[in-house]
Curated annotation (Swiss-Prot):
InterPro entries documented for this protein: Ribosomal_uS4 (IPR022801), Ribosomal_uS4_bac-type (IPR005709), Ribosomal_uS4_CS (IPR018079), Ribosomal_uS4_N (IPR001912), S4_RNA-bd (IPR002942), S4_RNA-bd_sf (IPR036986)
Protein name (database record): Small ribosomal subunit protein uS4
Residue segments, region Disordered: 20-45
GO cellular component: small ribosomal subunit
Origin species: Synechococcus sp. (strain JA-3-3Ab) (Cyanobacteria bacterium Yellowstone A-Prime)
């Protein structure tokens, strides 16, 4: 399954108006699921509930099903909570770090900044949105007028609050990762245990 590129507000409505900050900052006027028009909703099966949680993660972070499987395999090999390890790996993607630093209003916008060569990690240009950042990494905007103007405009209206595990100098457009993100500061409104259960039979 490829990355979703369709109408974003339709996705928000599908989940009953749930906030997916990585996907979009807009809010639908109508939070009823598309096509429901007030009809009574059927009770969801356990599989449907787990599938929905998995879809929330995929759509919030903009990852494909193949990428999700790869992250899940890595998370299962890690120590501690598999669900937390999964979310931390997604939060440490370069596109998500750029978003959480306030350099872009959404993760799709951050992905474009990275892929178009506007972002550097530890002084080197990185154009891979899925690049896995590490604690101590320094993320900066390339020293080009076009890059700095674009990010400076975004930084005036960040999509989310700056989490404690990051620091950001708005004047220098420079951020640093201080530590791994704790669960309470991860921007995914999901039950990660259900996501782990969904993939338990696939791995």
């Amino acid at each position: 399954m490829s990355r979703y590129t369709g109408p974003r507000l339709k996705i928000i409505r599908r989940f009953g108006g749930l906030d997916l900050p990585g996907l979009t900052r807009k809010r639908p006027k109508n939070t009823n699921p598309p096509g429901m028009h007030g009809a009574e909703r059927k009770k969801k099966s356990e599989y449907a509930i787990r599938l929905e949680e998995k879809q929330k993660v995929r759509l919030n972070y903009g990852v494909s099903e193949r990428q999700m499987l790869r992250y899940m395999r890595k998370a299962r090999r890690s120590k501690g909570s598999t669900g937390l390890a999964l979310l931390q790996m997604l939060e440490m993607r370069l596109d998500c770090i750029v978003f959480r630093l306030g350099m872009a209003p959404t993760i799709p916008a951050a992905r474009q900044l990275v892929s178009h060569g506007h972002i550097e990690v530890n002084g080197r240009k990185v154009t891979i949105p899925s690049y896995g950042c590490k604690v101590g990494d320094v993320i900066t905007v390339r020293n080009k007028e076009s890059s700095r103007k674009l990010v400076a405009a975004y930084a005036e209206y960040p999509g989310l609050f700056l989490p404690d595990y990051l620091e950001f100098d708005k004047e220098k457009l420079r951020g640093r990762i201080k530590e791994l993100p704790p669960r309470e500061q991860i921007c995914a409104p999901v039950n990660e245990l259900l996501v782990v259960e969904f993939y338990s039979r696939k791995l």
